[in-house]
């Protein structure tokens, strides 16, 4: 349906482009502890966005969970690992990018819900990955061509394939499939 084009482009932008680019750059700039803690904010973000855009009710247990989860994440980030970090060149920027990643992925899960009510999972994934690939291409092309694919050992190629297929494609596929019957806050 032509009226769904903008939603497909929007969820591809949120779920494939912004989400992935901010996540990987945030990992590069921040610490592993901070990245793990900030990514745990995603369910809180989904709950808030679902209440705003999908009219899901916020009750006392949900609001309490938001407050406790957010407080715990902030405490861990501020008071967590106090040791000197060598390989995190810009922790504040990395943390902001990781928060942007969590927000964009949460928004993706909320906004893709409408598409799951209308289209098959494979159809959504096909268009989302295609559109997302075109969106990320200008940013990732220079890194991609620097890789010496011919000299890469098979075990490295196999591991890259595993990450792309199992941890990326299957995760997105199963999330979209689950959204056909469940609200985003459950996923």
Which residues fall in each region the model found?
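Structural signature of hydrophobic alpha-helical transmembrane segments
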Residues: 25-42, 91-103, 155-165
